[in-house]
Amino acid sequence: MPFTLGQRWISDTESELGLGTVVALDARMVTIMFPATGENRLYARNDSPVTRVMFNPGDTVTSHEGWQLKIEDVKEENGLLAYTGTRLDTDEADVMLREVMLDSRLVFSKPQDRLFAGQIDRMDRFSLRYRARKFQSEQYRMPWSGLRGQRTSLIPHQLNIAHDVGRRHAPRVLLADEVGLGKTIEAGMILHQQLLSGAAERVLIVVPETLQHQWLVEMLRRFNLRFSLFDDERYAEAQHDADNPFETEQLVICSLDFVRRSKQRLEHLCDAEWDLLVVDEAHHLVWSENAPSREYMAIEQLAERVPGILLLTATPEQLGLESHFARLRLLDPNRFHDFDVFVEEQQNYRPVADAVAMLLAGKHLSNDELNTLSDLIGEQDIEPLLHTANSDRDGADAARQELVSMLMDRHGTSRVLFRNTRNGVKGFPKRELHTIKLPLPTQYQTAIKVSGIMGARKSAEERARDMLYPEQIYQEFEGDTGTWWNFDPRVEWLMGYLTAHRSQKVLVICAKAATALQLEQVLREREGIRAAVFHEGMSIIERDRAAAWFGEEDSGAQVLLCSEIGSEGRNFQFASKLVMFDLPFNPDLLEQRIGRLDRIGQAHDIQIHVPYLENTAQSVLVRWFHEGLDAFEHTCPTGRTIYDQVHSDLIGYLASPENTDGFDDLIKTCREKHDALKIQLEQGRDRLLEIHSNGGEKAQALAESIEEQDDDTSLISFAMNLFDIVGINQDDRGENMIVLTPSDHMLVPDFPGLPEDGCTITFERDVALSREDAQFITWEHPLIRNGLDLILSGDTGSSTISLLKNKALPVGTLLLELIYVVEAQAPKQLQLNRFLPATPVRLMLDKNGTNLAAQVEFESFNRQLSAVNRHTGSKLVNAVQQDVHAILQQGEAQIEKAARALIDSARREADEKLSAELSRLEALRAVNPNIRDDELAAIESNRQQVLESLDQASWRLDALRLIVVTHQ
């Protein structure tokens, strides 16, 4: 290589050193100093890994003093270059800048600059970059973007609600599905969509204290959303880091009690500028016109400051219209301001629901019924539609569906309230109860008597809670030596049951963690039964491992022993046998226990086994749950209401189970109340609301589309390619699972989302649902999204050289593959990616500027090419630099037309879609007051900003590949 003192060179292997200067030479070696980093490098004169930096007319360079020069002419004198041109800060012409005076902190960011500077990437990195651009652009444009990445079954009614609400501006809705239909999952899907699209960035979730960990686990395991749990301790710690502790995290979970207890804390929460507020168990927010509770007022303050709200409740509105109104009032206080007016409105919607029932029944409508429909949709001429709907002609069904759709748009609360019931959603198993009455051991009888004497001052409720768990009473007196499991007949029964059903998975739930741990030891030591334990003292990772062991078919645990709190948020549909070793105190917890198995997707009927001790609080509770509420074999929406009504009487029987006087009457009363309330619920079922919430065929089609996308293998090949290039080790674990671990030679030291000790992944939804230790990889998973960002935000793969062996073309023929990106810059919340994500446009130009891209498909062409090492590549580039410059100029001329077409198409689509949505809502505003003014204003503002941003869209060269034809 011809070196001269003062020449500027760049290192091929350490480009971060910047621009180097030749400072010493001898016969064999050259010393190059890199002023930007203060380092020297000694290279062999022959074959050193450095490239001469030479700029061309049209380039802009920076001097060491900071001013810039637009080059018009380049002269070489004694091996050194001098650039002449116009100085950009003063517009002075004919300014000369010698190469030794160039800024040393030079970074080559443009693909063509990197190519000419010898910074040539591996060929496979170029291919990965193009694929990453292509896939990322396609994913953003998918209509179900944000709905595929969660570790959940594809259940139509959940997808329908999430798809509807998740795309709204600052949604304010009440999710009121019955127990077991997945409100938490619906809320998670909505959050996931809003966060992924940029519509929301800061989220606050407020839940009862006992559900904090359930939400933490669900959000992380199902949606890869890493929330922070704020309690008194975390709040105090965060006060050292910020004036407002809640501004230290973007995603926060805290308890309702935590929010209510401190005025200062509530002020900090209100000032923290959340985008979305989620409140679970919203029926606990007690309200009356004259005396709202402190909890309600706290959430009301937050609701006034936070644009988007999701309220979750399982309590049907028929069991408390006033509290139902209170929840709607939180969503839109202007719309729901007067309870009496609300009651009257609800009664007026009855004809709407009846009309829908008539249409769906498919019967011919009477004149009165036709008149009712005309009155309900009075602002439009629907006579032709009614005529078709009431005929036997083709199109009658379609006409009926259109009328139902029109009625739904006019329905009172269908935009703010979603409610699915088990009657309206198919796919649930039956529940069969097996009670096992067992004798009360004398040891327990003695312990209970002594406890009664010593605990005489305890309240009836405390005594009742004690009496449910006699093993706890016994251990209080006997201490750690109290081996209750040696004589408790429930333990003998459990061991017998498990040994008789060795091949079947059994979930055992008990109230206390200590009971679960002791049972595991007994089962292991006495019968060699493999049992996993699951309790609140374990970390999330430990619980994952226990759940995964239970989920393994052949070598896994036969039994999972759960404590009450430990099992929250976990579902085990692959098991269908449930043993309740003891009973919970209230119907909600009972339903929660059964709900671990009784989910949509459960393939078998659920066998519920309840071994109980006679003449104890357990025997009282078994009868009350089963005979009074029918709560074991059916979901019990009436349970909490009846429990609140008979609470004190029930507590009395539980505290003194030997006193059975009047208990039969209590059970009879409860059953009558239960049956009456069920009839009331059934009669009050809002069929229209259920149809709207369920989504029907539209929801089914959405689920099928996502399922089809799940089967697409392009993600797997892309992910494997990505992991290879980033330097992540992959170890096939079998059962469609792969273990990823960091290597010593990664593209970046810490790959975001990959733990130090690695992780297990799967691309199969079914595997992810049964194996909680395996992460479910989709295009929306952080590992893939972070990988895409890593490749595309830097210059990885932006310039490369390949050889094409093709004897049909002359040796030395040049082709230049150019990847342009058309994009628009805008705030994330505008969700511009729906219309114009960063979109790659590929040109394949020959020396004459002919674009061959349409004839030469990328993947098949890529397979015909071979790589060139960096040193040879640099020599090739230097030899053909002038030709490459000429082809690049032709590329710039050709891209404008293609880019303009893309931008114009995106602008038309955005204008049509956003204008249509605005027009639809404005038309409905006249007949449905649940459409908020601020929502309409936001859509119009959004439309204007989107169109302005698209007008500013531009394009740039993102990557290029120089291809040279060879015959060898």
UniProtKB/Swiss-Prot annotation:
A motif (DEAH box) lies at residues 280-283. It is an enzyme of class 3 (hydrolase). ATP binds at residues 177-184. Residues 164-334 form the Helicase ATP-binding domain. The gene is rapA. The lineage of its organism: Bacteria, Pseudomonadati, Pseudomonadota, Gammaproteobacteria, Enterobacterales. One of its GO terms (biological process) is regulation of DNA-templated transcription. Belongs to the SNF2/RAD54 helicase family. RapA subfamily. Its EC number is 3.6.4.-. This is RNA polymerase-associated protein RapA. NCBIfam families: PRK04914.1. It comes from Enterobacter sp. (strain 638). InterPro entries: Helicase_ATP-bd, Helicase_C-like, Helicase_RapA, P-loop_NTPase, RapA_C, SNF2-like_sf, SNF2/RAD54-like_C, SNF2_N. Residues 490-644 form the Helicase C-terminal domain. Keywords: Activator, ATP-binding, DNA-binding, Helicase, Hydrolase, Nucleotide-binding, Transcription, Transcription regulation. Interacts with the RNAP. Has a higher affinity for the core RNAP than for the holoenzyme. Its ATPase activity is stimulated by binding to RNAP. Transcription regulator that activates transcription by stimulating RNA polymerase (RNAP) recycling in case of stress conditions such as supercoiled DNA or high salt concentrations. Probably acts by releasing the RNAP, when it is trapped or immobilized on tightly supercoiled DNA. Does not activate transcription on linear DNA. Probably not involved in DNA repair. GO terms for molecular function: ATP binding; DNA binding; helicase activity; hydrolase activity, acting on acid anhydrides.
